[in-house]
Amino acid sequence: MNIRPLHDRVIVKRKEVESKSAGGIVLTGSAAGKSTRGEVLAIGHGRILENGEVKPLDVKVGDIVIFNDGYGVKAEKIDNEEVLIMSESDILAIVEA
């Protein structure tokens, strides 16, 4: 994938969610709902502050993150793969191993 987000934007690939129904049936994809976890594929250079300085992002490529899947998060299809473009402020947490 050849994409470079600008400023404080982050490209995230949503992780598939797997859950079980009350009867123990494993649900995947749309039946399980949309995951709010994903892997960071690319990051911008950082947020531009009022004084003109660039603040580097806290997330890095490869991080697994939990994000707010709402207004401001844009889904795009790039190289036949759906990715999400969001601001770093849409990321709520980094999952640490």
Curated annotation (Swiss-Prot):
It is found in: Cytoplasm. GO terms for biological process: chaperone cofactor-dependent protein refolding. Keywords: Chaperone, Cytoplasm. GO terms for cellular component: cytoplasm. Belongs to the GroES chaperonin family. Heptamer of 7 subunits arranged in a ring. Interacts with the chaperonin GroEL. This is Co-chaperonin GroES. The gene is groES.
